[in-house]
C-alpha cells in the first residue's frame, strides 16, 4: 500500500548539539515516504554548514533571524504545500520519537481525516512521565490545562479528543492548512501558536486528537530547577517580574484570553484581557508578600542578611 507523504518540519536556532540525536531518531522510523525540512533561522554556531556536510539528504531552508518558531515552521509548511505533500509534521529538534511514529499517526489520520493529531509527549529524562497529553481550555477565562500532564505512563487504548494538541509533534493534513491557514506568526511568534491554530482549525470543522499508542520524548529541563515551580518564593517572584520569558508569557496569555472570547462569543471585548491582568497583579502581589515573609523567617532562623539572597 502506498504511504502518504509527510514533510517533517523542524525549526532550529543555535543548537548544533541536538542535530545528530534528533536526525538519528527520525531516520530510524519505520516509514519511507517522508522528507525532513529543517529551517535554520539565523544560527551562528555552524548548524547549516554542519547539516550540509553531514546530512545532505535533509531539505535546508534559511530564515532571516527574525522568524522565531512560528515563522520558521510556516516557511517549512510553505515548502511542503508547494511540493504537494499530504501531511506536515511539526517537530522540535530537542526530542526523539518511537520508530512507529509516522505509521501510527498517518494510520489514524486515515481513520480520522478531519483531525489534527499528536502522540503522547514524555520527558526524556523520565521516560514514563507525561509532559503533554493534550490541552484543555476555559473559553471564558482563557486559562489552559494539560491532559494527563505529570502523570506516569497513562495508557489509553484509543485516540481521544482535546481542545488543542501540542506543537512538539503535530501531524496536520494539508486540507487543514488550505482551509484554516498556517500558524499566526503576527500574534503568536513563539508560544501558544499551536493552541490558536487548533482553535482556528476547529472553527473550520476539524478536530484535535491525541494518539496514545505512539510517543515522543522531549529534552525539556527538569522542573526541579524551574523557577516557576521553585519552593523558594523569592526566586519565583524575581522570575515573575523580571524574566523576559515571563513577560512574553504575560503578553501572549493576554492575547489568548482576548482571542478566545472573540472566537466563542463572536465579538471583541476587553473583559477577558482585563480579568487576566487582574489575576497577574494579584499573583505578583501574593508572591511579593510570600517573599518578604519567607526572607524574614530565614533571616531570623539563620541569623544573616538575606536582602540579596535568591
Model-derived segments and spans:
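Non-catalytic, C-terminal membrane-associated alpha-helical segments of glycosyltransferases
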Residues: 230-310
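A conserved acidic beta->alpha catalytic loop
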Residues: 40-49
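Glycine-rich, basic loop-to-helix element that forms the pyrophosphate-binding segment
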Residues: 63-83
Amino acid at each position: 500500500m502506498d504511504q502518504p507523504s509527510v514533510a517533517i518540519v523542524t525549526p532550529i536556532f543555535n543548537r548544533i548539539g541536538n542535530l545528530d540525536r534528533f536526525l538519528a531518531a527520525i531516520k530510524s522510523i519505520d516509514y519511507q515516504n517522508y522528507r525532513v525540512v529543517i529551517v535554520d533561522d539565523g544560527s551562528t554556531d555552524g548548524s547549516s554548514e554542519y547539516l550540509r556536510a553531514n546530512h545532505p539528504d535533509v531539505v535546508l531552508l534559511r530564515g532571516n533571524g527574525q522568524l522565531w518558531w512560528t515563522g520558521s515552521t510556516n516557511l517549512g509548511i510553505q515548502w511542503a504545500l508547494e511540493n504537494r505533500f499530504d501531511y506536515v509534521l511539526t517537530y522540535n529538534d530537542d526530542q526523539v520519537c518511537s520508530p512507529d511514529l509516522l505509521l501510527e499517526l498517518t494510520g489514524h489520520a486515515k481513520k480520522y481525516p478531519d483531525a489534527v493529531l499528536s502522540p503522547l509527549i514524555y520527558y526524556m529524562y523520565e521516560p514514563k512521565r507525561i509532559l503533554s497529553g493534550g490541552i484543555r481550555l476555559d473559553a471564558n477565562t482563557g486559562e489552559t490545562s494539560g491532559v494527563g500532564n505529570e502523570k506516569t505512563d497513562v495508557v489509553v487504548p484509543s485516540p481521544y479528543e482535546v481542545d488543542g494538541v501540542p506543537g512538539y509533534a503535530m501531524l496536520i493534513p494539508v486540507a487543514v492548512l488550505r482551509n484554516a491557514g498556517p500558524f499566526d506568526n503576527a500574534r503568536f511568534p513563539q508560544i501558544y501558536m499551536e493552541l490558536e491554530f487548533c482553535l482556528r482549525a476547529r472553527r473550520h470543522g476539524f478536530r484535535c486528537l491525541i494518539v496514545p499508542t505512539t510517543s515522543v520524548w522531549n529534552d525539556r529541563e527538569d522542573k526541579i530547577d524551574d523557577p516557576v515551580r521553585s519552593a523558594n518564593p523569592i526566586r519565583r517572584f524575581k522570575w515573575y517580574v523580571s524574566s523576559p520569558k515571563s513577560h512574553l508569557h504575560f503578553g501572549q496569555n493576554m492575547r489568548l484570553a482576548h482571542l478566545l472570547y472573540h472566537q466563542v462569543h463572536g465579538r471583541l471585548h476587553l473583559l477577558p484581557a482585563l480579568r487576566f491582568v487582574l489575576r497577574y497583579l494579584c499573583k505578583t502581589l501574593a508572591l511579593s508578600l510570600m517573599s518578604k515573609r519567607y526572607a524574614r523567617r530565614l533571616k531570623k532562623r539563620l541569623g544573616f542578611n538575606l536582602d540579596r539572597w535568591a
